[in-house]
Amino acid sequence: MTLKIAFFTLILLVSIERVYSSDEEYRLLKDLREGYDPVERPVADHRKPVNVKLRLILQQLVDVDERNQVITLVVWNQYTWNDYKLRWSPEEYGNITTLQIPHGTLWKPDILLFNSANEHFDASFPVHMVVSSNGDVLFAPPGIVSFSCSLSMTWFPYDQQVCYLKFGSWTYGKKLDLQIDDSDLPDGHKMDLQYYIPNGEFDLLATPAFRKSTTFLDETYVELYFHMHLKRRTMYYGLNWIVPSILISLSNILGFTMPPECGEKITLQITNFLSVMVFLAMVSEVAPPTSESIPIIAAFFSLSIVILGLSICASLIIVNIFFRHPKTHRMGDWTRYVFLEWLPWFLLMSRPEHTFCRPRREEEKNDEEAGGDGTKLLENQQHQPRPRLLVNSQLVMDSTVPYLEEIIGYLKVFKAKLDDDEEEEEEILNWRFMAMVIDRLSLFLFTGLIFGTTALIFAFCPNLFTDSPIVDIE
């Protein structure tokens, strides 16, 4: 047991000895610190600027908050510059070529992200600086940065966004020459993407960058703009938003294939109406409340809601017409011509054979003429001279004429009632057939509206089949 303790103690002492710097490194650090001031700019001639290169290493696109117009990234800001006071000859210091010096002990540029949306503005982690023997200083602080971006939601979810990160010195003007470090980077990219983790919602198409000089209070400042061209992946929204909405609209169309008197189709259409309202509410949760434009998917859902609302109104009208009665509603001549003759022909509808009744006035006139002839016939027979042998028959006839006239009257009333019933039944069938015609017309009309509006909206979407940017980044 004692031997084990001694062995681990020896290993610990060796490790501690290795952690401590050597005499050469200690002497080198002492010589470099002598006469060094971290406030002083690292230039021999104060009239010349400090050349600082910035290389933006993008690791991950964490979040795109459309509602708050904020994008969150994990980046490494790699700054490089040369400090003439930090040069040494490696042969004089045990072949030491690099040093790791804590943050805050050397001069560093006051470069910030101007459009930062972080709570503390600068979210970079203070790491050590790496100094080479030729005076080159490497400072690469990692950080989770959030920056504001004006996101255009017009073509959501088939949208493309172009956002930028604006870097620049906060106080140094012409005294700091800020450059883009794009060495060994592919065309179209000014960000280093060798450690980039692809995002599940957006594709990163390009990362151009530009250098721009601005003047503020008679001082010229250099600013770097790193753009990000993002294209949204639409499979999620297509499968979970658009396809269900289209299926709901199609099921609403199928409601017009049900019998006109069926009230369940109104229940189906109201359910579909409320379902699309839920999808529209989901869009409102994503889009910013002060959006300058309406997202295309919101327009699609809004048009679907309008079409569904109109289909509900059409179904109510169809049911109302189907149950109309001739005693309460009279069909006009133009209505009869349009909905019973012209539209059925136009919609290729065939009506089973039916018997049309003659106008009532002609029937009554014929009945009156028929009734009058019968009465006159009886009267003529009553007053016509008859042979003597038929005297008894004449007496019988005279006694039965009133009864026959009463029977004829009852027959005329019964026939008129049958004619009225037939005419009423025919009128009821006309109203029902008119409801069927409007139902068929609604089927064709709303089918065309749904497919037409869907094709029209997505046909005008400029980013559906192209990767071209929607914002000019020059």
From Swiss-Prot:
KW Cell cycle (keyword) present: no
Organism of provenance: Caenorhabditis elegans
Glycosylation sites: 95
Gene3D superfamilies documented for this protein: Neurotransmitter-gated ion-channel ligand-binding domain (2.70.170.10), Neurotransmitter-gated ion-channel transmembrane domain (1.20.58.390)
Purpose of the protein: After binding acetylcholine, the AChR responds by an extensive change in conformation that affects all subunits and leads to opening of an ion-conducting channel across the plasma membrane. Nicotinic acetylcholine receptor in the MC pharyngeal motor neuron involved in pharyngeal pumping. Has a role in the determination of life span possibly via calorific restriction which affects growth rate, although this is independent of metabolic activity. Plays a role in the defense against the accumulation of ingested live pathogenic bacteria in the intestine.
Cellular component, GO annotation: acetylcholine-gated channel complex; neuromuscular junction; neuron projection; plasma membrane; postsynaptic membrane; synapse
Quaternary structure and partners: Neuronal AChR seems to be composed of two different type of subunits: alpha and beta.
Renumbered residue ranges of the record's region Disordered: 359-378
Family matches, as PANTHER family: NEUROTRANSMITTER GATED ION CHANNEL
Transmembrane residue ranges: 238-258, 266-286, 303-323, 441-461
Membrane side Extracellular: residue ranges: 22-237
GO biological process: action potential; chemical synaptic transmission; determination of adult lifespan; larval feeding behavior; monoatomic ion transmembrane transport; multicellular organismal reproductive process; negative regulation of gene expression; nematode pharyngeal pumping
A GO molecular function held by the record: excitatory extracellular ligand-gated monoatomic ion channel activity
Name this protein carries in UniProt: Neuronal acetylcholine receptor subunit eat-2
Annotated compartments: Postsynaptic cell membrane; Cell membrane
Cytoplasmic membrane side: 324-440
Domain of life of the native organism: Eukaryota
